[in-house]
Amino acid sequence: MQLNIAMISVHSCPLGKLGGGNTGGMSVYIRELAYELGKRGHLVDVYTRAHEPVHDQIVELGKNARLIHLKAGQEEEIDKLAIYPHLAEFAYELENFRKYNGLHYDLIHSHYWLSGWVGRFIQRVWNVPHITMLHTLGAVKNAIGIGKREPDLRINSEKELAKDCHRIIAPSEREKEYLIHYYNASPELISVIPCGVNLDLFRPLEKEIARSHLSLDGEVVILFVGRIVPLKGIDKLLMAMPYLERGQRLRMIIIGGDEHCQDEMERLKSLSQILQIDDLVTFQGLVKQEKLPYFYSAADLCVVPSYYESFGLVALESLACGTPVVATKVGSMENVIRFGETGYIVIDNAPHRIADKIAKLLSMSKTKKEATSSIRRSVTQFSWSNIAEAAVNEYRTVLNSYFSKV
């Protein structure tokens, strides 16, 4: 049976530049899942806020999948919290669009707490089940205490969503445990479905070709990919560099960051100067997703030094390109990384621990290193085809349960 699915992503456009203030793994998740669901014959409309006046209202994401921009406040990039007063307007525009175009949806799948607010409101109007995925949890961020404190408005909204939505999708068992612990969510209403990786895009390239393409030579390349925010622990990665053998020609490449991340970027650049490693560090800025496989393939390893990840999509992308990973014990890293084979997991992001595992990977002889193709094979079960199948099964389960009670 074909499903008509309304996805809501108010603050983050799935086609936005990755690595910026409002665009990251969630944007990739929504775009890839919508595309794969459309390929399977389901109809998917993704609703997002117009953040530029030049946007086409409707953009095709793929077969049966559309991105629809709705006006809610000024058509410009604004802080996430500043979007909250415009959520009612967004919901009103969404319902107007649906009515005008004669659309019917079987279910709502919202992403992030702002979208969850809209989903709760619209659900009562449409009388269909509301499934949410929060992607990160404000209470967890506050418990960690790194970066800007999340407001009570977000915490309370997430608690309400955990109480009255019809299903919460968590990308990892750890995130499920957080939902239960911090928000008293019912375990029976939480389903764990991991994130996926585009195996057609993220694939191994010849290292020499990738390095030539990026004008890199024989340096040992350590890669970071992600948003430039304190929670990512990039400062800890920089502080790990002095622990490494300086006899090697090291190059650290940091990908990510836009005008919304300037304060953190300047802090990190200043830190690299204090550590006297600024000549070893390249702040690459934003990189288009289609170019990322060149960086992953050119790198000797990728590091995920985060304090918190709900899943850890970057690790999947790196491994799919055949490049090993050193990551903190966050998200689903224990299920993604094969310890000592495709990478290492550290209990926290203490610089000496990160440096130790980087050194271990770099010291492995090529005969002991798992072959690039084997590293890639370790994550093929995370194809978007498999993730979409799991999502559809969950949608059907929720629909059957919802309408059996009506």
Q: For each of these PLM feature ranges, what is it?
A:
Residues 1-67, 403:
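N-terminal subdomain of nucleotide-sugar transferases
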Residues 251-269:
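Glycosyltransferase donor-sugar binding loop
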Residues 265-287:
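Nucleotide-activated donor-binding/catalytic signature segment of Leloir-type glycosyltransferases, i.e.
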Residues 307:
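Aromatic "clamp/platform" in nucleotide-sugar-dependent glycosyltransferases that forms part
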Residues 324-327, 337:
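Short hydrophobic beta-strand element within catalytic cores of glycosyltransferases
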